[in-house]
Amino acid sequence: MSDVRLIQVPWYLGREHPDLSRGPGVLAEAIGAETVVVPGPEPRPVPNEVADSFDVIRSVRSAVSEAVADGRFPLVLAVNCFTSLGTVAGVGRDLGVIWFDAHGDFHTPDSTPTGFLDGMGFAMLTGDGWQEMRQGLRSVPVQNSVLVAARDLEPTEVARVEARALRRADADTLEAAFDVLATRVDAVYVHIDLDVLDPSVARANVLSVEGGLDVAQLEEALTAIQGRFEIAAAALTAFDPSQDPEGRVPEIAVTLARRLAPEKVAS
């Protein structure tokens, strides 16, 4: 696995979380590859969740950029999905995005009912919200993005998805969506929030909801992506080991890592 670099990001909104912060390390141990850990933000006189989170995003950008420069495939293991901004920026070239998630992560400060920053990750990546904080980070045109297997969205989020014409797909329609995306981009960032899995298969976190993908469906989706695109970087996010007492998620993560970079990850 010498061509893969695992980039652990064990920070939840810029801070340590008693359960979620363990997730990246557990996944890294299961996958087994060269690993770096992204440092947390410098302490501030007055804690600032947003500023701390963007500090982490920029640290991810640096770690991914270094991996690419070293000829390594960057596989990010993160708590928060908004780390995707750092990953795409670190790759340093135009990419499409394929986003697997039970949720849309497509809110902005104007649409969110909760103010939860990680519920805005995909929206920020496609150019909406927090413009000043995003300075110097890349955005991806929404028409170069696909949201897969999302099934738990608030009404205001659904309205935003429709207004922005974000392409959505499920297990039955994802190949057609990938075909359309392949007419626009050659390389993609693949984002897998592990709660895309149906909780009957494995419960990734407390936000897991029924109606998700099984492992075979997710493997088939990744094979379809490999057949159409270069995968420039990928992420596995939002794993809470306290919700997975049987240890199913790390085993699945190994399978997914092999599908994401089959020529780079040993069997």
Question: PLM features: residue spans?
Answer:
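A short secondary-structure junction signal
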Residues: 108-111, 133-136, 156-161, 201-202
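Internal, well-ordered alpha-helical segments in soluble enzyme and binding-protein domains
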Residues: 23, 118-121, 141, 157
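Active-site histidine-anchored catalytic micro-motif
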Residues: 70-135, 144, 229-232
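Cofactor-binding loop segments of dinucleotide-utilizing enzymes, especially the Rossmann-like FAD-
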Residues: 9, 100-102, 127, 150, ...
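Active-site flanking residues adjacent to catalytic metal/cofactor-binding acidic residues
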Residues: 7, 79, 100-102, 148, ...
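Catalytic metal-binding/acid-base residues of hydrolase active sites
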Residues: 82, 103-105, 151, 195-197, ...
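Phosphate/diphosphate-binding glycine-rich loops and adjacent basic-rich segments that engage nucleotide
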Residues: 134-155
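Catalytic cores of soluble, metal-dependent hydrolases
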Residues: 2-75, 87-90, 158-267
